[in-house]
Amino acid sequence: MGTAADPSSKRRLMRTTDEDDVVGGCRRGAEDRISGLSDDLLHSILLQLRDTAEAARTSILSRRWRRVWAFLPELSFGYDGSESVPAAAAQAHDRVDDALAAYSAATVNLLEITMPYASPTGGVHIHTDRAAPWLRFASERLTGKLSLSLPYDDGAHEEEELLLPQCERVTAIYLDVTCTLRFQLPPAGGAVFTALATLEISSAGVDGRELERFLSTFCPHLKELVLSWIRITLRDGDGDGDPPVLSIRSDSLRRLDTSAMGSFKGVLKVAAPELRSFCPSSCGQRDLDIAAPKLSELLWISPCYDPARHRFAESGRHLRRLVTSTSIRHAAVALMRRFDIVDELNFEVSISEVHHLPHPTYSLRTHISCRFG
């Protein structure tokens, strides 16, 4: 396994000896009541620390404590601005490597890694080959949530590729990376992300056809999908000058949020028979073709709505909740006419300041919520 324990990693992480220990030294003067607690209680205590690297430092207390942190049910590595200089950031990367190499449990419920952001004076970049072993660890041992956030580097390394390996037991994936994200998919098909219920991808570049295949074939239980500020590579529609088409097909999807996909100028097609909630992009230049007969919540923050371009062909005419804004007055009216019944209407009221009147006026922005029935 690519994440086998490395003795040198353990030595760096623990920094203790077999001859003596801190708790042993204290025990000569007072009774040690903490080390006698159950592993479950000690895990609860260590999980309150800032991150797993701090929990690993408790290894210096005694031989008893050396195995406690290595069986934590959750691994979290979060770093603040103090690690934003290159040398400190490199140490942060090493701490993640060492902790994963020394981890002893067969499975882990959470793997959360947030790397330092670049400093104003010196960029901190993590090459994808450095982050790849972390994803392999998740593929082999994670049974819950995966969250990976790498530094934003102004797109200087967009062409680097990061491969998301097959993760059969991972239930939620949150990826915030500026590189190109690839999916490890078997050629013969098969559900390789069988437990995945939530997927959020931010800032990454993705191949549109690969994303389509991944969502439609390999995520049979996906419930929630968020695509935020991603760069989608797509060929033109049929080679006849038509705009490119991104198709999202899922029999299980219930919530779809593409509100921050402003860079995509093509056609978004959605076929999701179980979709309940949809939040499209704020960019009104994209066409929509939505087939979602169970749609009940629509969050429309786009500056325009054109029934000829934004089609809800197989959606009903009864919404549980509609969110829109009067700042896009004509679009809001046209959108509300699309549905006969709305149980809850939330809209933002914007009144601009008028300069030509004899008395001063003021701009106003507020939210109004109306419930009917």
What are these regions (language model features)?
Residues 180, 206, 230-232, 261-263, ...:
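Hydrophobic lipid-interacting interfaces of membrane-associated proteins
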Residues 133-137, 161-168, 186-195, 212-221, ...:
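A structural signal for leucine-rich repeat
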Residues 2, 23-252:
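Leucine-rich repeat
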Residues 1-27:
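Terminal membrane/secretory targeting segments in land-plant proteins
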Residues 11-15, 64, 371:
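Basic polycationic patches enriched in arginine
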